[in-house]
From Swiss-Prot:
Name assigned to this protein: Uncharacterized HTH-type transcriptional regulator YezE
Gene name in the database record: yezE
Gene Ontology terms describing biological process: regulation of DNA-templated transcription
UniProt keyword Glycoprotein, yes or no: no
Disulfide bonds: none
GO molecular function: DNA-binding transcription factor activity; transcription cis-regulatory region binding
Keyword Acetylation: no
The HTH tetR-type domain, residue ranges: 6-66
InterPro entries: Homeodomain-like_sf, HTH_TetR, Tet_transcr_reg_TetR-rel_C_sf
Keyword annotations from UniProtKB, A to Z: DNA-binding, Repressor, Transcription, Transcription regulation
Residue range(s) of DNA binding per entry: 29-48
Amino acid sequence: MGRNKEFDTALVLHRAIEVFGEYGYEGTSLQDLLSHLGIARQSLYDTYGTKRDLFLSAVKSYLEGKNAAVMERLEAPGSVKEAIRDIFQEGVNALRDPERAKACYIINSAIEQIPHDPELARYFERQSKQLEDAFYHGLLRAKDQGELNGEDTDISALARYLNQSRLSLTFIAKVTADMDRLQDHVDVSLSVLD
């Protein structure tokens, strides 16, 4: 008969997101994980498998949570343009907060691994497409509501652009401490909606 887990798996995943976000996948040792997660080596292996398995679980937990929030916001009643602005602004606010930013940086760690990990690459592609589709459907609604100018607006290209611009926020925040530059990126990115 197996033993019951004596730790909160959701909390452990949250901590793993922060550790991998702060140190990167390659820079995170097993000892770093054990120390930050507060669990025994065998518990880590029994619950998550290898370091890579834990990393994939952490990335998936982070992305699925963030993507669900974005999709929910895009599907909510009201102004789609305002929803998109809120989504981008929430990204900036998260990156301005050092504690919340740690979690965001797991995306950079994952992107570093994509060339070496086809499973992770396919997962990112699916998640990115899911968000792009959410932006697309939101933009269609915005067009129907009269929020977008121009009959010939390429909704597909605009959805792809917004998705990629949003994803680039973590990279920009990682390479500069100047949050005004991050806000400039958001303002210019969203100017296509005007």
